[in-house]
A protein has these predicted regions:
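N-terminal accessory segments that position/regulate proteins before the catalytic core
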Residues: 4-236
Length: 236
């Protein structure tokens, strides 16, 4: 009984101590704990557990997959020049169709190549990632659009198949009300992180790398949008 009492008191004291810290204090503590020093690296696992390597591709059981058309060499309209991406309104805005949405994701989050070595095969993607671990997942939330052959709702982008998994179907009226304030021809893109994909290699620094990867994904999404004459606005 004494042992249990001591444990409970200790845990209670620890919890009170944690609650007394502000969110900023916790952030500072995390960064202090996980930073590299001039004379040493931050703590890490020290090895890679290959038997438990995370799956780099997320799929949802039972979710219908809508294939997206891949880009072709004679794609119309042709991809604009790199310089023109930095001149607002120089690229005509394309309607939101299945083809343009496909190009958007292919430029931003898709697979770009496969590599193989000693019997191991892995993919490269258009968005850079620390350790090529790719914790970032992309989603699109849309209402009924005149030229977009998709039901209103939430979709998950599956890069391996280059398709959209239908995750949540919504009545058109509800989808419209949920997207109030978004331009009539606009849609929402969401990004999430699977932290285990990073923690498997980088341990407690994984949260840092996940935020870094989100930044890379926002960058490629912004460039992909610009090639279509679209404007990407980061909400949160």
């Amino acid at each position: 009984l004494t042992s249990h009492s001591v444990t409970l008191v200790y845990m209670k004291s620890y919890m009170v101590q944690q609650k007394s810290k502000t969110a900023l204090d916790q952030v500072k503590q995390y960064h202090e704990q996980t930073k590299h020093e001039f004379n040493r690296y931050a703590r890490s696992l020290g090895y890679l557990d290959w038997a438990n390597q995370p799956n780099p591709f997320r799929r949802f059981d039972g979710a219908p997959l809508i294939p997206l058309p891949h880009l072709t060499l004679d794609e119309d309209p042709l991809s604009p020049s790199y310089e023109s991406l930095f001149h607002p309104h120089s690229i005509p805005s394309q309607p939101v169709t299945l083809n343009s949405l496909s190009r958007f994701f292919e430029y931003a989050l898709s697979l770009t190549a496969w590599k193989a070595y000693n019997g191991t095969r892995w993919a490269l993607r258009s968005n850079p990632s620390s350790g090529n671990l790719h914790p970032t997942e992309g989603y699109v939330f849309t209402r009924s659009l005149d030229e977009l052959a998709l039901e209103p709702g939430l979709y998950h982008y599956a890069p391996k198949e280059h398709g959209l998994e239908h995750r949540w179907a919504l009545p058109p009226e509800l989808a419209q009300s949920m997207l109030q304030g978004i331009p009539s021809e606009g849609f929402l893109v969401g990004l999430t992180s699977i932290h285990w994909r990073e923690a498997w290699k980088y341990g407690e620094r994984a949260f840092r790398y996940c935020q870094h990867d989100i930044g890379h994904a926002i960058g490629t999404l912004r460039i992909a949008a610009a090639t279509l004459g679209w404007n990407l606005l980061v909400l949160s």
